[in-house]
Amino acid sequence: MTAAATSISSIEGFGLELRPWDAELVRQMAAWGERGFPFHAFDMGHLRDPAQAEAALLVAQQKSPHHHYVACEDGRAVGRVSVNLQDLSGLYIWAVHVPPEHAGRGVCRRMLAALMSHLEAALPAAPEFILSSNTFAEPAHRAYRALGFEVVETRWHFDKEIAERLWKVGPVQREPIGRHIRFHSGRWQVRTYVFKRRRGTPMDAVAARPR
């Protein structure tokens, strides 16, 4: 696997270190537990394949407006997040993921708090923070709201990963997210929230601190 250097610097804060991807972190993420449907698109099991792991690392280390981080706690990978610094809508945060074995300790909130605090200081003229999330991801929404995000739009969206799996699962598996999906114009769609956080919006310090 390549050991190519990346120009992205680490970020420290809220008990975490957000580090750029490297071969060791890819190995750790490959060993994470998986959530499965309907959150399967975030699972990292594909990194167990050496070819896919190498390809993913190459993408993550490319010089790009997209910066990819792995949140580490005492050297252990506990979450991941990416940000597009040149999206027309704002500083677009995406690929927010905490594996099940690290849930319940505020990793998501702390990871985003560290990232946004750093970007606000490093890019004083940068626009607002934006992220989108499928409406069934309610635990994530609690974290986003605690950090000052507000829903500014609700839309129906074609999510390729969700749509492909919906063709394969039965009514029983679809039922828990039934009110969040629809079959429209010949394909499956999922309802999505667009969240926005204005620069300087207070973050819930209790929600973001290490536990």
Describe each PLM feature range.
Residues 163-194, 204:
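A C-terminal cap/extension of S-adenosyl-L-methionine-dependent methyltransferases
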Residues 99-101, 105, 135-136:
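Active-site acidic-Proline motif in GNAT/NAT acetyltransferases
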